[in-house]
Amino acid sequence: MLSAAEGILLCVVTSEAVLGVLGDTFIALANCMEYAKNKKLSKIGFILIGLAISRIGVVWIIILQGYMQVFFPHILTFGNITEYITYIWVFLNHLSVWFATNLNILYFLKIANFSNSVFLWLKSRVRVVFIFLSGCLLTSWLLCFPQFSKMLNNSKMYWGNTSWLQQQKNVFLINQSLTNLGIFFFIIVSLITCFLLIVFLWRHIRQMHSDGSGLRDLNTEAHVKAMRVLISFAVLFILHFVGLSIQVLCFFLPQNNLLFITGLIATCLYPCGHSIILILGNKQLKQASLKALQHLTCCETKRNLSVT
């Protein structure tokens, strides 16, 4: 039986998940409709569709595993349920982070303007960067799937053996780190590109101020808005993996639903918050969302009039 605090936090997690799924579904549908209309899909459009679809799967897996862990923890030890969930999770989570990294790099190379020779080389060879990241993703999958299979087999064999669990704490943490090396690489690349873009925008704003453009200059406002979006993304991105770390640590603790659900809240903040940030920060998505809201409002008004 859940306590009042645990019940409230679980409602918060569920709300985050619903908002995240709705936001990502809208992003995917809007870009698919744009492709159907123009018969052409940009790199950003392709990345947004892939990011939205993979993140919908990630959210469903997080919620499914979270509810099972809270209400039916013993089900996870039956058959191959844990194994199937883990494999799907690894595939979708790596793919989601890969798409997010590609999106950050694409925005970085498109917006930033450094005189560094490495940056100029990367900017002229965007396709090479994507191919390299694709190779990193495949390598990460090939390395982590066998390791996860070994970890799951060991946990099945010794499940319930308290002494074995105590002995395997350090081994488990090392294995978790090794299996997530690919994720760590993409996280570092995303945060570095995000930081460099923030630095570029900050320098550009200072340069515009020194030239006497003023705070109300449209370009300055756009740059400030972009900086806020980037900082929000970085915070949510970090919180997502902090939440995942909390869930992993719960493996070593007696059943603590409050801590576990807190980890779920932090984990679900990123897919929910980032989808909203993408919609508000993208002109086409923002216009499409406003049209959708206007359409829903009109439908609701007509429905109320017909009832009366």
From Swiss-Prot:
Several bitter taste receptors with distinct ligand specificities are expressed in a single taste receptor cell. Residues 1-7, 65-94, 149-180, 254-258 are extracellular. This is Taste receptor type 2 member 107. Glycans are attached at N80, N153, N161, N175. It is found in: Membrane. Belongs to the G-protein coupled receptor T2R family. It comes from Rattus norvegicus (Rat). The keyword Transport does not apply. Pfam families: TAS2R (PF05296). Putative taste receptor which may play a role in the perception of bitterness. The gene is Tas2r107. Keywords: G-protein coupled receptor, Glycoprotein, Membrane, Receptor, Sensory transduction, Taste, Transducer, Transmembrane, Transmembrane helix.
